[in-house]
Amino acid sequence: MLNPPHFIIIGAMKCATSSLYQQLVAQPGIFMTTPKEPNFFSNDEIYAQGIPWYEGLFAPAPPDALRGEASTHYTKLPTYPETIARIQSHVGDVKLIYMMRHPLQRLVSHYIHEWTQRVIATKTDINAALDRHPELIDYSRYSMQIQPYLEAFGPENVLPVFFEQFCNAPQQELERVCTFIGYPHAPQWQELERDNVSSQRMRKNKLRDAIAYAPGISTIRKNLIPKEVREWIKDRWRMQKRPELGAAERERVTAILDQDLAQLGAWLGVELTCATFKTAACTSPTGWPGWPSL
């Protein structure tokens, strides 16, 4: 492959990958693809476009820039089973960044996202959705998702980053990421507008979107309709209350996730459960001392 990425943010979905992407875009000498998430190695229909299409995403990069992309589909097993083999085949040596957050909170944000995208039906609450959409739990099973990457690329090429510590000490975590990818300069955290916030997303509606985003309409809307009125209208299309798991479902899901976290914690050298996750994450485990191949 010509000019392959030097690094890839591989997930997890709803774990601040967009924020990290934006911060890396803001650093001189780092080139990130547009779109943020090519999903080339995961999605069959995109992979079918061929390597030249993917190479073209990096064509605008300056010759001496570090090149990266950020596709959260790359850690969505079992949905996309061919991802790792494709990365190995076409990219070879690459640095991988895996962002994680409290798995129950990630699950809830994932549910909201899928609700806004109409993947989950309007009247399907989060408890019913767990059985109909097992990916809500699967994508929060971090050890299951990251194990094949550790096996394929080695722990020295996979950086664990925790959402909680990323929010708590952003400059420190940005420096850690940049050191990992081989960035030769001192990165500076930028105060940027938050993007991809699930609670602010409106549920998709084809007719509404066709009218609202028609050429010229957006400018008229912003100039003639007060912001307060626009926000009131948007709220009609947003989830009004953050969903909560029922007691029985929370207990069931916690048991599944705790089993997965026990394995993840063993590799990271910290005790991890749903109950201890936030505290442990802020100790910022930086490597994989418990990985058996070390």
For each predicted feature, which ranges?
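Anion-recognition interface
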Residues: 1-294
